[in-house]
Amino acid sequence: MGRDGRGLRLAGRVLVPAGLALAAGAILVIGTRYTSATVNGGAMDPTYPPGELVLLEKVDAGAIRHGDVVLYRTRNRYEGMAVLQRVIGMGGDRVRQSPGGPVTVNGKPLAEPYVKDGDPSGMAQEYDVVVPEGRLFLLGDHRANANDSRFFLTEQAGSVAATAVQARVPDSRTGLLVPALTALLGLLVAAGGLTAGTVSWVTRRTGRGRRTR
């Protein structure tokens, strides 16, 4: 154990700050890359029902893909509130739909197993638009209850700027798992250092007591 627990004291002095630094760095990564939002309406039901807390990863406009569920905010819709919708069309895509029929993108029907009650149409009228470059055509998964791009067709074909996107739902939580485990490891290292420091202190106190006698 070393004279009067000096080895443990040194371990404590090294491990506590090192562990806390590791945990703080990992938590900073999580805070920088990820956010969350609570679903307020039923537009994304059944995929994300009202009240569900959704984990989101922050992305740049260039990283957005077809099918992504994104959180975006635009000043001229929804009173400036952030909303969650699915990316159907991107710049240059031709998006079409007839009542009761499937959504087609560039002439190909979309397979949409996520839509509410298997209904890809809802109450919307027929539309046929070409998405402007740098913009997105977005729909809710509950087509009969979503106030989405279909209802703003006179505003640049119902699209919103890709730069309005704040975050998207990640494909998996693996990306979050690494920094989360790193943070946990850092806390365990700090706890180990604290334990070593405590044992060292007790050892020194015990040694002094024996010498006093």
Residue ranges and their predicted role:
Residues 1-213:
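Extended hydrophobic leader/signal-anchor segments used for secretion and membrane insertion
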